């Protein structure tokens, strides 16, 4: 499925289905011995969406052999490391007194329910209306209760989401912790720049931001093809690589530095090692100069 201007989705189609796949890996990671992350709602959310290949992933029943890039355990480690990185951004910001958090393209993210937020924290979740409605209803049916004040902002990030965020009670005069997890790869180059411009315009001094540091050259080369192969082999009807926007673009880190942010990049290999994992050499070669990015606005 090739992307088009104005395309929409729910959690079983297009970009939305990738959020379900990531939640499936979080469910599997949560059941590992001595788990790096704990997402007690991921499994139920995946099953509620009902995509068979994602349910099989969550249950650990998918077997893809013969390629370290396609190994289920490796994919589980990757999502666990990624999830933990963004968890820690929010935890550190809260410890420093930040009481406003924004999750962009929140999908099946349950941090508003599973993290131990400081008293007085408001968490804003921004995503497509049908995605927000499904998750809110399903978690309510499960009896889940947010651990912070949760406010939903049902808007497409290609529309005027800053206005919708302010209408939901967001205060740009207060420092904010932002995450854009697994998002930039699905945006055209100019939309990525516009997103970072908007985040900056809404950020008071003391704000934090975390996202991926992507080597976008790899998507047009080997990695994009391999990711597409993996999605087909686990039973998806989508070629995930068709959802990516490839081509030349500003790196998020350089662009944010130009906007006045102090940027730190944690290479993937080091992020793995932080938690006792080893990034396979072939994955390291395919991922290129990729990792995780955190930024602080002084």
UniProtKB/Swiss-Prot annotation:
User: Family, per the entry?
Assistant: Belongs to the UPF0677 family.
Q: What is this protein called?
A: Putative S-adenosyl-L-methionine-dependent methyltransferase MSMEG_1480/MSMEI_1444
What SUPFAM superfamilies does this protein map onto? S-adenosyl-L-methionine-dependent methyltransferases
The entry's keywords: Methyltransferase, S-adenosyl-L-methionine, Transferase
In terms of PANTHER family, this protein maps to: S-ADENOSYL-L-METHIONINE-DEPENDENT METHYLTRANSFERASE YKTD-RELATED, S-ADENOSYL-L-METHIONINE-DEPENDENT METHYLTRANSFERASES SUPERFAMILY PROTEIN
The record's function comment reads: Exhibits S-adenosyl-L-methionine-dependent methyltransferase activity.
The Gene Ontology biological process annotation of the record reads:
methylation
Which NCBIfam families does UniProt cross-reference here?
A: mthyl_TIGR00027
Entry EC no(s): 2.1.1.-
Q: Which domain of life is it from?
A: Bacteria
Q: Which GO terms describe its molecular function?
A: methyltransferase activity
Q: What class of enzyme is it?
A: transferase
Q: InterPro entries in the record, alphabetically?
A: Ppm1/Ppm2/Tcmp, SAM-dependent_MTases_sf, SAM_mthyl_Trfase_ML2640-like
Annotated residues that bind S-adenosyl-L-methionine are located at 127, 156-157
- Which Pfam families does the entry mention? LCM
């Amino acid at each position: 499925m090739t992307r088009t201007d104005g395309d929409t989705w729910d959690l079983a189609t297009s970009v939305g289905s990738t959020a379900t796949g990531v939640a499936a890996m979080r469910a599997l990671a949560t059941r590992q011995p001595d788990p790096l992350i704990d997402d007690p709602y991921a499994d139920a959310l995946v099953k509620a969406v009902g995509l068979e290949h994602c349910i099989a992933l969550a249950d650990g029943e998918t077997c893809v052999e013969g390629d370290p890039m396609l190994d289920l355990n490796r994919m589980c480690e990757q999502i666990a490391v990624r999830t933990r990185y963004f968890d820690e951004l929010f935890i550190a910001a809260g410890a420093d007194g930040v009481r406003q958090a924004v999750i962009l393209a929140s999908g099946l993210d349950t941090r508003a329910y599973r993290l131990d937020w400081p008293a007085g924290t408001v968490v804003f979740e921004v995503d497509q209306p049908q995605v927000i409605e499904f998750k809110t209803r399903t978690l309510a049916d499960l009896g889940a209760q947010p651990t912070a004040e949760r406010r939903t902002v049902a808007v497409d990030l290609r529309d005027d989401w800053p206005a919708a965020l302010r209408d939901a009670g967001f205060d740009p005069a207060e420092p904010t912790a932002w995450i854009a997890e697994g998002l930039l790869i699905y945006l055209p180059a100019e939309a990525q720049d516009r997103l970072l411009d908007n985040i900056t315009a809404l950020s008071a001094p003391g704000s934090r931001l975390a996202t991926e540091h992507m080597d976008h050259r790899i998507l047009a080369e080997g990695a994009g093809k391999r990711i597409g192969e993996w999605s087909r082999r686990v039973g998806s009807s989508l070629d995930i690589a068709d959802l990516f926007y490839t081509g030349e673009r500003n790196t998020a880190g350089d662009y944010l530095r130009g906007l006045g942010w102090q940027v730190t990049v944690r290479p993937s290999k080091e992020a793995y090692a932080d938690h006792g994992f080893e990034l396979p050499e072939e994955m390291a070669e395919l991922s290129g100069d990729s990792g995780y990015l955190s930024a602080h606005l002084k």
